[in-house]
Amino acid sequence: SEVKKAIKNEIINQLDFRFLNETWPEFDLSKPDGCLPTTESLVRVIWKRLKSHLPLKSLRLYENPKLWADYKGNAMDAYLTVQTHFAAAHRLAREDLPQNENEKIFGKCARPNGHGHNYIVDITVKGKINPRTGMICDLSALNSLINDLVIEPFDHTFLNKDIPYFADCVPTAENI
């Protein structure tokens, strides 16, 4: 197809098994507008190289299965997503309903002693690509925030009992 041909010719054949810092002029740091080939910068440069060949709406580039960047053609705006996980137990039930009603509404999640899930969380931040660093945020700081605000508080807890917010709120995926 034309899509595969454009991607192969304009991107894959030029980048595969190459040292990114020296492959394209956009990554030449001796030039005033040269940038580092971070995931965020790379997805933006790929967009610029493909836009004359394809009717792009958005572009996603995976650095690895748990880290990717999205670009939608808007100047230096990009999105960075970190995927992580935590394990937690919960019981979905309303105290004002009998057990059989809770089971009809919430299924196995209404078991009297609760049960557990392995939750996968995608956390996406939007920002401007910094011309000096090629990044939209400090990835180490973002990972620390995710750990402090999501993983540590929720991992291996019984949400209904260990997280005060869920004392009066049913811990559905939407509420978590």
Regions found by a protein language model. Give the residues of each.
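Charge-rich, low-complexity N-terminal segments
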Residues: S1-I176
